[in-house]
Each structure stands twice: as C-alpha cells, then as structure tokens.
Amino acid sequence: MIAMVLAAGLGTRLRPLTEKIPKPALPLLGSTLLEENLALVARLGVREVVVNAHHLADQVARIARSAADRLGLKLHLSIESPEPLGTGGALVAARPLLDRGETILLLNGDVLTDMDLRPALERHRAERPAATMVLRPMPAGADFAPVEIDREGAVLRIAGLGREGEGVPHLFSGIHFLESVVLDELPTEGPSCINRQGHVSLLRKGKRILGHVIADGRWSDVGTPERYREANLDLLEGRYELPGREAIRGVFVSPEAKVSPEAELRAPAWIGPGARVGAVPVGPRAVVLPGARVEAPLADGVAYPELG
C-alpha cells in the first residue's frame, strides 16, 4: 500500500494565519498537521508516501522531508503549479507514483484524528470495493455534505449525488482507501474532485463504494480558526490518544521561549519555542504557539504567531 497526503490547499478559511504559514505547517503544540498525518500513515505500516504541495510549497516540502526521514518513510513530492488541482487532480498528477496495483490510502492534510483505521483497511481488503470511505456519525447541526450509506455499508450518495435508495447520512472523515479504478474516472487534466467526479461517477455505473463508520476516537477537520483553536486545546489536555501526546499536567515552557519573571503561569499551559510572554497571567488551558507574543491575560485560548 502507498499513501498520499493532500497538502496543496490554500487554507482560505484560516487567513491571515495561512498567508505566511501553509495549512499543513500550522503548529499543533510541538508538531504540525502534516507531521501528525505522516505519523498516522506510518502507524498503519505504510512505508511510501506522496505529499502534494502548492501554496508555500517550500515550507510543506521541508516539513515533509524532515518528518519522513524521522518516521522511516520514502517520500515523493508532487508540486502543483500554476494552480492547485483539487483532490482528484492531485491523484491524476501523482498517478505515475501511485498506480502500481496497490491500494492507495488518501487523506486530507487538514485532518487530525486518533481513529484506529486498521479495521477499515481490513474490511477494504476483504470486500474489495472500488473505494472505502472512512465515515463518522453525523453530528447534530453539522454543515458537512453528507455521505449516505445503506444497511450493509454501501455508499448510495455523496452530497446528494449518486443512486437511489434509502440511506443514513454520515460525515466523511477525509480518509479513504482507493483502488486504481477510481483514478480512471477522473479528468486527465485540470482540477477535479475525487468525491464528486470519481466516486459519484462509479456509483452511477453501479460500482460498489463502501462506507466504513468509526464512532470511536477523536476527529477534527482543522480548517477553521475555531476548530484549530479546539485542536490545540484538546492536545493540551491529552484528549487525542496519540503516541507522545499525553496531557500537559503542569506548565511546559520551551527553553527557546522568553517569559517575563513577573508572568503568572497556571496549569495546564504550553509555551512554544520563540514565544514571548510579558508580565501577565497565562493559563489555565492556554497554548502559546511558536513565535507568538502574549502581552495580555490568556486563558482558555491560543496565542498565534506574529505574521509581520
């Protein structure tokens, strides 16, 4: 199996943060989104991965190389220019690297999760659908486009497109296992969407796509300022069961941070490298990300890096 992490998005919902930092490089305490996703790939036993990049591609490439080396992954970079190619076009551009008769693990680069994906992979290998979409129960009031599945777990519709039948709506996690037949459905040039142009096309041809529901574990689409804030605070409190991600019981201060001796630090709190904290209260439940500056009280929140 080979994996691909989609890391070429513009991160428009996270501006102005993403004007200087690409979304996959956004800090999550001492890590980044991209590093967490590459670690997820490695935990599944995958040893080869493609990472695409477009916006601030040099930063994405630098993090990907460092993390892949640390995790023992063979890395391929797929640089998209002059425009990002979407989730489908990214696969087409990287097809020479991906299309080798193996299952492809594809995941969105803005997902943070501790879900155990092994049962989904085992089911995909046993049932051999064209694709297996990893799903979550749909939260009440959520504004995500639904993926509807029948009682056997077969996908009927994606965002209302597909085939007839009575289905139950679920939330797509941004993670799927694919066979190369999916790539055959995508336009050979330009941007495209794997779900709307790949999966929906297969559904209309009567091909089987599986929806595997995982209710356990935590999952977040870290694509908005509020969800990015929540992800950092959840990591601070150890709510994600990830290796090396135990709760911060006290106060962590990086040796590279500068903290005023008059600052009042209250646990739990995390202060990253390059951060500066003045003579103010910080905590409880405070995350000061690398390069951030705090000159006013901070509690139950996240201080972001300066963008000047």
Language-model region placement:
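N-terminal nucleotide-binding beta1-loop-alpha1 segment
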Residues: M1-E19
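Conserved N-terminal catalytic core of the sugar/cofactor nucleotidyltransferase
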Residues: M1-V5, L29-N108, L117-P119, L298-G308
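Generic preference for hydrophobic
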Residues: A3, A25, L77-S78, I158, ...
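Active-site metal-binding loops of divalent metal-dependent hydrolases
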Residues: L10, G109-V111
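Hydrophobic packing residues within well-ordered alpha-helices of enzyme cores
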Residues: L14, V60-A64, A231
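Catalytic-core segments of class I nucleotidyltransferases/pyrophosphorylases
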Residues: T103-L105, L112, R118-R125, M138-G141, ...
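A short, conserved acidic/glycine-rich loop-to-beta-strand motif
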Residues: E127-P137
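Structural signal for interior beta-strand "rungs" in well-ordered beta-sheet cores
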Residues: E246-G308
